[in-house]
Design a protein with these regions (language model features):
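Outer-membrane beta-barrel proteins
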Residues: 46-52, 56
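Alpha-helical cap/lid subdomain in secreted, periplasmic
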Residues: 54-167
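Short, glycine/acidic-rich beta->alpha junctions
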Residues: 20, 49, 122, 126
Length: 167
């Protein structure tokens, strides 16, 4: 079985900064003697995680794979600019091309708790749609929160995760 992993820096581990040692996902893979494919990238949005996971499973065999996905914070976005995807989050902008700096500044000013709750509700549905897609592909999977749960989405209003989401 292949352990497919995606998420933000929590799923990537110390390697994001050129560190040494093993991430927790590497420990999981080692413990169960599994090969691993880790598509995690620091500061990833749910959009990037879903996009790259679907690309991976569309272009590679899904036979005998298990997906482990860690979700970051809900305000994060992915912007496509000149055929390059950029991870966007509050306070993280130095990697952006100059032509995106003004857009980023406007975006950052709009980020408050009410916008976070709104995005949390949107992402809740996007992640559930991805969960259903993985089920259609017959790919077993587990999702977990790296940062926090779905803010503003009451437990009784959350969709049925079929025991695939640890929140």
């Amino acid at each position: 079985m292949l352990l497919y992993v995606n998420g933000d820096s929590h799923s990537l581990g110390a390697m994001k900064d050129g560190g040494v040692g093993k991430s927790f996902v590497q420990h999981v893979a080692d413990n169960f003697d599994l090969p691993i494919h880790n598509d995690s990238v620091g500061a990833s949005s749910a959009t990037r995680i879903i996009r790259t996971a679907k690309e991976y499973f569309t272009n590679n065999s899904t036979d005998n794979s298990f997906a482990l996905v860690g979700w970051g914070t809900w305000e994060r976005e992915e912007w496509l600019y000149e055929n390059t995807h950029y991870n966007i989050m509050v306070g993280w902008y130095k990697h952006l091309p100059e032509k995106l700096q003004e857009r980023y500044t406007r975006w950052e000013l709009e980020q408050d708790y009410s916008s976070l709750v709104k995005k949390s509700r949107i992402v809740h549905q996007e992640i559930h749609d991805f969960h259903l897609w993985l089920q259609e592909q017959k790919i077993p999977h587990t999702f977990f929160n790296c940062m926090y749960n779905f803010q503003g989405v009451k437990t009784q209003d959350q969709v049925d995760w079929n025991n695939c989401y640890i929140g």
